[in-house]
Amino acid sequence: MASILSVESNTCTRCGSCAAACPMAFIRIGAKGPRTVPAAQEACMLCGHCVAACPAGALSHSRLAEHFAPLDEAWRGDVHGVEQMIKGRRSIRKYQQRQVDRSVLTAVLEAARYAPTAMNTQPVKWLVVYEAAEVRKLAAATIDWMRAVVAEGKLVAGKYDPSPLVMAWDGGVDLILRACPHVIIAYGRQDNPMAAGACIAALTTAELAAIPHGLGTCWAGFLHMAAMLHPPAREAIGLDDGCVMHGALMIGYPAEQ
């Protein structure tokens, strides 16, 4: 059975870096260079470690893009810059009333898709609620759920009285989605037990990826709870059948720095 790796024999030094990097131990080094074992045909997780680890750039993988996106190695030495970005992250609850260009949101999600997923299954799906009117509909659906909670004399998550949030909404103040211009929702297949963790990791990565673009974010926890507990809210979000929301971010330009 053919190997799923292609090797440039004139470049390969048979150093074994690719075999050492393979998390599934699917690569063997022979006289003609590395080859994959038969099990790799079905079980390779397509992580790309083998190609990335080759110091000579001699490997290509039949199921991966021919060229990997190059990395600027300078970032590895900027420990202070990375730490400052992580420490400087804030939950933003006041936004400028202007849209973010779609290309910028796409760039944020493009970075977020590199967040880790179990076995490289990449189960995260995205829904971007772009128009402000649609964002307000989701906030309204969440308020409807809270009205029902108040009417039943219950508390949100067994702790919080939602009536002040409902009163604020009725007074024209949105404390649910903070009048943000956009919402990013991460969701996955309901039958995939790894989707929840992957979505949370991806949203966390999106938070950081948004910072260099001058964007602020905040987790939309009330919307998430409504989506889990209130069928009309789930319907308002409009996910594909068999899918479940695992988290959401408000996103936009901060009104204050």
PLM regions: where:
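Short linker/helix segments within small regulatory modules
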Residues: 32-45
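Iron-sulfur cluster-binding cysteine motifs and their immediate structural context
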Residues: 17-34, 49-66
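A glycine-rich helix N-cap at a beta->alpha junction
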Residues: 147-155, 159, 234-257
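Small-aliphatic-rich amphipathic alpha-helix that forms the alpha element of a beta-alpha
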Residues: 13, 108, 112, 182-184, ...
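Glycine/small-residue-rich phosphate/adenosyl-binding loop
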Residues: 127-199
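Specificity-determining recognition surfaces
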Residues: 20, 71-106, 246-257
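Ferredoxin-type iron-sulfur electron-transfer modules and their immediate structural context
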Residues: 1-21, 25-28, 86
